[in-house]
A protein has these predicted regions:
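Substrate-recognition element of Asp-dependent hydrolases with the DxDx(T/V) motif
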Residues: 1-18
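Short, acidic loop-to-helix structural element flanking the phosphoryl-transfer center
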Residues: 1-4, 44, 87-88
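Short, solvent-exposed loop/turn segments at secondary-structure junctions
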Residues: 9-12, 37-38, 68-69
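Short acidic capping loops at alpha-helix termini that bridge into adjacent secondary structure
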Residues: 26-30, 58-61
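His/Asp/Glu-enriched short active-site or ligand-binding loop at hydrolase and phosphoryl-transfer sites
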Residues: 28-38
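Conserved Lys-Pro-Asp/Glu-containing loop-to-beta segment of HAD-superfamily phosphomonoesterases
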Residues: 40-68
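Acidic, Mg2+-coordinating phosphoryl-transfer loop and its flanking beta/alpha structural elements
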Residues: 58-94
Length: 100
């Protein structure tokens, strides 16, 4: 499955991420970053930017987030959204969904 990164960040912080985690970033098909979009989670515009970038119906997108308010916002846009609690819980959710 293609991965996308949706992040509230700024140029300074993201420069650090690029410099120190480039090997991780290469796994993402696209990066939807708040400072580039001009909108932050939980605002509608950043989720709309994600939907445009992915190009799939919202229900076909699995959004994983550790902030409950952002999960709720994603769901208002029709995304399938899970709260991230722990790696073990996430693996269990993926297994139940047939994705692991």
């Amino acid at each position: 499955y293609p991965l996308y990164l949706l992040s509230n960040t700024n140029p300074l912080h993201f420069r650090y991420v690029r410099e120190h985690f480039a090997s991780l970033l290469k796994h993402f098909r696209a990066l939807i970053l708040s400072y580039r979009v001009g909108s932050r989670k939980p605002e509608a515009a950043i989720f709309q930017a994600l939907l445009r970038e992915v190009g799939l119906p919202p229900a076909r997108i699995l959004y994983i987030e550790d902030n409950e308010d952002f999960v709720a916002a994603a769901r208002t846009h029709g995304l399938t959204a899970w709260i991230f609690v722990s790696p073990q819980y996430f693996k269990e959710r993926l297994t139940v969904a047939g994705l692991w």
